[in-house]
Amino acid sequence: MREIITLQLGQRSNYLATHFWNVQESYFTYSENEASPVDHDISFRPGIGADGSETFTPRTIIYDLKGGFGSLRQYNALYEVEENVGMPKGLWDGNEVIQRQPNIPQSEYQKALELGLPLPRLTPETVRYWSDFNRLFYHPKSIVQLNEYEMNSQLMPFEDWTVGEAFFNSLDREHDLLDRDFRPFAEECDQLRGIQLFTGTDDAWGGFAARYIDRLRDEFGKKIIWTFALESGLKTEREKQFLRAKNSAKSISEISRQSTAYVPISMPPSKLPHYVNLNIASEWYISALTSVAVESVTLPGRLRWYEGIEPWFLDNAGPQRIFALRATIRSENSELPFASHLRPNDSTQMDTDEVDHDEIEQSEQRFDLGFSPIGSATRTNNTHIFSQVQVVRDSKCNSERPERAEVGQGLTSHRLSLMTGYVPSTLSNFRSTLEFPILDSFPSDLIHEQGPAGSTLRVDAALSATSGIGRDLKNLQQTIGRRIALEEREDLINGLHELSHAYQAGWENDSDSGDD
């Protein structure tokens, strides 16, 4: 078994991850004659409930600030225990006065879910917290509330990267967070494959995540770590906008170096196609749209068919670790663009002379949803794709074999670039007939012609490392450099410059980029 442990840091991440886990639960099958195409043991852990019954809960650790969990309790129906809230006798002989904050009431959806009643339709008004549309039970050790900071506090806002960094260091000194929170899940694994991290990166959670990943690298060495770096795509006042940009720049500079794949995501995307009906005032809507792309592009790592294949690794493709996320979404009654170009594949490796460069270009053109604030620069004839993972989910697919295309005559991409100065394109394509399921916890009108709960969406999603990322990193470097304090400037600017250079070496030089 090759398990994955998920880390969820902060409110925005928990909205996205709740959609993700709801979808994973929908893949469960309950008949011996019906096998799920998804290997649930990768992301879920078996256990024993308080009454001795077997449980199966997400292999995840959820961090949020005080007030961020809504009505979700640490001990749920599976693990209900009587808590001894009194102090041990002998320590205090006086009267006890216990002060409790009032509990946040459950949503009508959660009440109906627990009682097995027909579920009411969710709306932006009834989804107050991510727990309001959650469909799963979590192990008590998965719930980690950080009481030192309160959600949406004006007195102690959790907005500055350095605040999150200092907060993690303080907690880690006192509790050793890896030993307390992470190691119990890691020790349950037969063969830990990697770590999937959802985190905010344009606020204090970026600093918290950076130091957490440092600890993970120290303890778990070369394990896969893929980071979904979530940023607010909504406009705000100028000073706060700059703080977000500075936080994002620090996160990119530090976290991407420690990640196998770093995927910056704007929530919501800056541009939306006509078929998306997005309520930008609702984190539930915004995270639902993002979840379609994220759950789809990570799907091959959970499918039984692709067991043993690492879609995140593209032949050791070199130093490009920042990937842009893009997608196209259609209802089950609509065709995906370029669907006619999907062809059956007889082998998992394509010869060099089979690489179709027109098909590479079409691969770029078919996406109409760009989630990444990095790599979103306008494509030019000089844009190069270093590597790309593409996943097509369409019930009409006539093949579920992976397809690999590489320009390089059998040499690894990294070795070829060292020998010739030219960086090849490496493309990995995965196809599955398993479409994205529409659940009753998903907004009912997000996609044009979207069907009711029980229907599906067709999805074409990709992660791409392109030379456009290098250009955007240089733009970010210039923007931050104009206003950042002198004591922070050198390390951050140099870090961004090194990252941007990885997307130019062997393809375009500094003089081509138009920078001084």
From Swiss-Prot:
GO terms for biological process: mitochondrion organization. SUPFAM superfamilies: Tubulin nucleotide-binding domain-like (SSF52490). It comes from the Eukaryota. It is found in: Mitochondrion. GO terms for cellular component: mitochondrion. The keyword Mitochondrion applies. Keywords: Mitochondrion. InterPro entries: DML1/Misato (IPR049942), DML1/Misato_tubulin (IPR029209), Misato_II_tubulin-like (IPR019605), Tubulin/FtsZ_GTPase_sf (IPR036525). The keyword Ribosomal protein does not apply. Signal peptide: none annotated. Pfam families: Misat_Tub_SegII, Tubulin_3. Involved in the partitioning of the mitochondrial organelle and mitochondrial DNA (mtDNA) inheritance. Belongs to the misato family. PANTHER family: MITOCHONDRIAL DISTRIBUTION REGULATOR MISATO (PTHR13391), PROTEIN MISATO HOMOLOG 1 (PTHR13391:SF0). This is Protein DML1.
